[in-house]
């Protein structure tokens, strides 16, 4: 099972969190550090990928419109995560709107092969994401604190260095509560994106969430 992750920020942390969660379901191969290009991933795969790996989690960097499309042809992701669209690297892209076009190439590639993409509700401010969700509503899940999110972060409280988090799946009418140990308000969203994706990949992970979140590495 192949999972691609992109976004203006948060993708490395989400990658590590998701890999840790999926480990309870099977061996995970994921790109170390911030390796996110075809060349870097190719070298990494040749050095470390083994036949026994069940999951491949790939960080996918955008260096221009079309770069994630090329990465997607290489990785062939079954699932995808878009963490955010921000104004980093606008000098490279020309505008935030062009960044959104580039990042949306991942969910477009995923839904084209019948897969599922989990995206931050924040990116729905950009037309490419609204378009792909309108065309494939059953293959896109939005996550965030916003009322309109498909999976809403309903509760997040930090107690003694541990977040108590409740996610509300507004479409299914279900809730999931779990604990998460990484400090920083931004890691609430990072953990929510990883959790929703992990449940899409293997719903049984929900039964083991308290066990899989405590050993996640603190990523800057």
Segments from the language model and where they lie:
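Phosphate-binding loop of NTP-binding sites
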Residues: 1-117, 121, 131-135
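Acidic, Mg2+-coordinating active-site environments of NTP-dependent enzymes
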Residues: 82-220
């Amino acid at each position: 099972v192949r999972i691609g992750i992109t976004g203006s920020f948060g993708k490395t942390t989400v990658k590590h969190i998701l890999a840790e969660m999926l480990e309870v379901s099977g061996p995970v191969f994921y790109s170390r550090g911030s390796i996110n290009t075809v060349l870097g991933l190719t070298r990494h795969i040749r050095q470390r990928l083994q036949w026994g790996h069940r999951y491949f989690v790939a960080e996918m960097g955008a260096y221009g419109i079309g770069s994630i499309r090329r990465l997607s042809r290489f990785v062939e992701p079954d699932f995808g995560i878009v963490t955010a669209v921000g104004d980093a690297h606008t000098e490279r892209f020309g505008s935030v709107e062009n960044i959104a076009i580039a990042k949306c190439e991942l969910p477009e590639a995923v839904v084209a092969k019948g897969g599922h993409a989990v995206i931050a509700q924040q990116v729905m401010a950009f037309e490419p994401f609204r378009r792909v969700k309108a065309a494939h509503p059953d293959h896109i899940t939005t996550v965030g604190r916003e009322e309109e999110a498909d999976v809403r972060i309903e509760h997040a409280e930090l107690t003694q260095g541990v977040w108590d988090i409740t996610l509300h799946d507004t479409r299914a009418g279900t809730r999931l509560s779990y604990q998460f140990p990484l400090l920083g308000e931004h890691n609430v969203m990072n953990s929510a994106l990883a959790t929703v994706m992990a449940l899409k990949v293997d719903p049984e992970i929900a039964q083991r969430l308290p066990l899989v979140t405590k050993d996640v590495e603190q990523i800057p």
